Amino acid sequence: MEISIPDEGMTVADALNADAGPIVVYGQLFDDGQGLRLCSGLTRSLPPICVGEPLLVDGLALVGVALEDHEGTMWSTDAVVLEGVIDGDTLRDSRVR
């Protein structure tokens, strides 16, 4: 699924290589029961699959985020911009911008 690229933030790949600290990152949210992740993109399958290495997302309230749901998998149809604190492969204290 192609997403429009926001004007702000870094890619998931860049975030995974970033030094620890506050960041702004964009991608598509994805949860197949193994925890909420931010992906660079999603496949066009149903349900979709995360493309590339995902960024784990910890502490995000999904209020106001448009999500699709199929067979226990949830994903955002549009790109989301998140800010939080990067800690290795996890975005902590995250919120939607």
Stretches with model-predicted labels:
Residues M1-R97:
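OB-fold and OB-like single-stranded nucleic-acid-recognition modules
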